[in-house]
């Protein structure tokens, strides 16, 4: 069981916010790929489970999330993407989540967000961070290859559909999602792009997204989708909400946001959603990790796109 003890040591190291060696990243990504390649585009997840939104490289706040929500493997987690970019510790954040996935594959589910993309990470921080911390782009390459293997969505007990962004005019059924070839860079348009980029909007039908990708979708679209697929609700992330979570359309869509004091300046709280075995909901609200627990690195300029 040398592999397990190696993994446990790497997890311990990453929990201390210490980097693992480039050769270890390569091996970790190879193991992760073997696990992720078996997962469906609509990955089945059993309750009880704790559902989390965007993390964005806020490593010490991810540790705070585990402090309030429980550690893996005692708690079963589903993370809805956007592990990287904007925060100071995208490398440590993503590698920790990946190491936990390899160590406890049935206790943590990772699905893809719009930032799990080569193009986006070259603009919003992860690429530069890999270069700065490892001295080359090799680690970024290993990680972005893994992004292509991440599932596009999950379904909890057949009743709660979880996706990073939202719905697509090209998709009416979960089976249509299952047929997408996901092992690629996030396209600029089309169903795979929409799942990762779309947002709910207080309207009916479909609207043009101000993000330049995906769509705005209304309450009638959600009602049709939920009925067609016999699901109770859609759970998604992708949008900052100051209270940590927000209901839309008469509690048929839920936004969960898990990066407190986003970008170290927004002043928002974060939330995670605990679902018990009967899918009863309990929200845990938490604030940013206290200052004394973090080593804040020198502030680096980031592109000021703020969505």
UniProtKB/Swiss-Prot annotation:
Subcellular location field: Cytoplasm; Nucleus; Cytoplasm, Cytoskeleton, Microtubule organizing center, Centrosome
EC number(s) given by UniProt: 3.1.3.16
Enzyme class of the recorded protein, top EC level: hydrolase
Origin superkingdom: Eukaryota
Record key words, sorted: Acetylation, Cytoplasm, Cytoskeleton, Hydrolase, Manganese, Metal-binding, Methylation, Nucleus, Protein phosphatase
Major location category of this protein: cytoplasm
Catalyzed chemical reaction(s): O-phospho-L-seryl-[protein] + H2O = L-seryl-[protein] + phosphate; O-phospho-L-threonyl-[protein] + H2O = L-threonyl-[protein] + phosphate
Cofactor remark from the record: Binds 2 manganese ions per subunit.
UniProt: Mn(2+) 1 binding residues: 54, 56, 82
Residues reported to bind Mn(2+) 2: 82, 114, 164, 238
Cross-referenced SMART domains: PP2Ac (SM00156)
Single GO MF annotation: metal ion binding
A GO BP entry: regulation of double-strand break repair via homologous recombination
Active site: 115 (proton donor)
Assigned protein family: Belongs to the PPP phosphatase family. PP-4 (PP-X) subfamily.
Protein name (record): Serine/threonine-protein phosphatase 4 catalytic subunit
Source organism per UniProt: Oryctolagus cuniculus (Rabbit)
Taxonomy of the source species: Eukaryota, Metazoa, Chordata, Craniata, Vertebrata
